[in-house]
Amino acid sequence: MEQAAGQAGADQQIAEAMAAEHESLSVECRADPARLERLLAPDFHEFGASGREIGYVGTAAQVAAATDPVGEPIRVENMRGWLLADGVVMLKYTSEHQGRRANRTSLWRRTASGRWQILHHQGTVTAG
């Protein structure tokens, strides 16, 4: 884990954001719109691997509709994290799902209640 200099508890915050990211990628979470929606910030937006910009409204339902609840899980490689400010973590990693690889970046924000929510996500398909 990497961190911004001088941030107390950086490793803990990065670990918590990573756990939330892994949850958001699990088949169980992706197949359950209510569960996924709890992880999305109300001002969530994404630049998907398709190049489309996606907002909060309807995202969880769309993901659930496209998720096979007994399907292949998303494989994650080389996840790294940076604490950008107290309660704000950026994650970078590579994913593979159904033969398709993508470089991914997520920005997570801790709420006043201590829960982590994803504010921004971008996926870029890689060649190979």
Please report, for each region that a protein language model flagged, where it lies by residue:
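Juxtamembrane and targeting peptides
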Residues: 1-8
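A solvent-exposed, acidic/Ser-Thr-rich amphipathic alpha-helical stretch
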Residues: 14-15, 27-87
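Residue-level marker for the onset of beta-strands and adjacent loop->beta junctions
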Residues: 77-78, 91, 104
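Hydrophobic residues embedded in beta-strands of well-ordered beta-sheets
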Residues: 88-89, 116
